[in-house]
């Protein structure tokens, strides 16, 4: 099985930081994950990866302290500031994944066995899009939200994919205001609008969306 290119912009991969990428990769394969064939050429980084949902990939990265993997294969555009001002408190929070009807249990098993994610109680909710099941990683600082189609959508063609990235921020409305000044547009409707709990951007390039969730940055503490 190989990953096929698509015409519309999508979330095609994400990476997890590990102490030993090869060891994590081998363990994932032993647990049943499907590996991605090595395609790195001479002088290119070989980053081990497994198949994720749909056509997406999940990479294992163990080089991130001294330099970024992007420093090896990419050069910054000369006219662009390589270190733009950061928005205070903005951090990665999680990923929203769409799954097929009655497929939530399968993905819970996948993420639990290979990455140590655990389901959260239904009463635990973040942001303004509360559907689906939340999974929490072992360090309690990254989340996956699995959403099945509901209503009549359950009977239509169901695509499984990574739908959007969530960013945590201690002040959602202040972050929305700063991002709007940078040209980011947010949804404003009767059902979906920015609040102190969260916000959702309008789709960009046809299909790419981002979500803001109220969350204070905190140190990673492993689950006991």
Q: Which residues does each PLM region occupy?
A:
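Glyoxalase I/VOC metalloenzyme domain signal
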Residues: 1-37, 44, 49-121, 128-224
């Amino acid at each position: 099985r190989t990953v096929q290119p698509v015409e519309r912009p999508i979330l095609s991969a994400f990476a997890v930081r590990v102490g030993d990428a090869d060891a994590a990769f081998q363990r994932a394969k032993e647990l049943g994950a499907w590996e991605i064939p090595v395609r790195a050429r001479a002088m290119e980084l070989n980053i081990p990866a497994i198949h994720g949902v749909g056509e997406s990939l999940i990479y294992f990265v163990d080089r991130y302290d001294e330099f970024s993997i992007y420093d090896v294969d990419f050069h910054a555009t000369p006219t662009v500031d390589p270190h733009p001002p950061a928005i205070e408190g903005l951090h990665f929070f999680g990923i929203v994944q769409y799954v097929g009807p009655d497929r939530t249990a399968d993905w819970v098993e996948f993420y639990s066995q290979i990455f140590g994610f655990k389901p959260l109680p239904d009463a635990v909710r973040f942001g303004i899009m509360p559907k689906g099941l939340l999974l929490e990683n072992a360090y309690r600082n990254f989340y996956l939200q699995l959403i099945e189609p509901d209503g009549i959508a359950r009977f239509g063609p169901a695509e499984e994919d990574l739908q959007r990235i969530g960013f945590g921020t201690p002040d959602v409305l202040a972050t929305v205001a700063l991002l709007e000044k940078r040209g980011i547009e947010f949804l404003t409707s009767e059902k979906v609008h920015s609040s102190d709990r969260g916000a959702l951007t309008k789709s960009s390039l046809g299909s790419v969306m981002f979500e803001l969730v109220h969350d204070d940055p905190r140190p990673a503490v492993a689950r006991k």
